[in-house]
A protein has these predicted regions:
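Acidic, low-complexity intrinsically disordered regions
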Residues: 12, 83-86, 151
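Amphipathic alpha-helical repeat scaffolds of TPR domains
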Residues: 1-5, 30-54, 79-96, 119-134, ...
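Alpha-helical repeat scaffolds
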Residues: 20-26, 54-77, 101-114, 137-153
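Helix-boundary capping/turn motifs
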Residues: 11-16, 63, 80, 119
Length: 179
């Protein structure tokens, strides 16, 4: 079983410790995988936000303590990689303080990815995202365009659990998009 599938299974069963251990081992054994770092950041950020996890407890503390170090390690390797820039920026817009950056810096990471790869439909989201958490028509149209493009949906799915989560968030915005 590949690590993305294994991670998905662990997250589905809410086996947080094994998920953390898996990703620590994956980035240790394959530290050239952007997707590994992106998914590791995703679970490090998501675990403390899970309703079943005591946000003051040991598991949340361990995830919070590890997140910035993992982010810094990945950033030192991938600061010019558009995939890393977009996905880490997207993740950081949820809880930018955990990444020790401000919201504008998180948005700029996404924007830099778009400038580097303007043909990537997903990265266009950086141009229309309204980070005041109100969604305007341009944002909705962009999500519908993303979801109606099979290549873009496939690109998102291939990222692993972080991509599946993005698609989960996007699906309610679409009535006729790819699901």
């Amino acid at each position: 079983m590949n690590w993305k599938k294994e991670l998905g299974n662990l997250l589905e069963t809410k086996n947080w410790q094994e998920a953390l251990d898996l990703m620590a081992n994956v980035v240790k054994s394959d530290d050239t995988s952007v997707d590994a770092y992106i998914n590791y950041l995703y679970i490090l950020e998501a675990i403390p936000l899970e309703p079943e996890v005591d946000y003051l407890g040991e598991m949340a503390r361990r995830a919070n303590d590890a997140l910035f170090g993992v982010y810094e390690e990945a950033r030192s390797k991938y600061s010019d990689n558009p995939d890393f820039l977009f996905w880490s920026g997207w993740l950081a817009t949820w809880c930018e303080w955990l990444f020790k950056i401000d919201l504008r810096d998180a948005e700029l990471l996404m924007l830099k990815a778009y400038v580097m790869c303007p043909e990537n439909k997903l990265f266009e989201l950086a141009m229309v995202s309204n980070r005041k958490y109100t969604r305007d028509e341009a944002y909705e149209d962009c999500i519908r365009e993303i979801m109606s493009d099979k290549d873009t949906v496939n690109y998102i799915e291939k990222r692993g659990p972080v991509g599946e989560y993005m698609l989960y968030l996007f699906r309610p915005h679409c009535q006729n998009g790819v699901s």
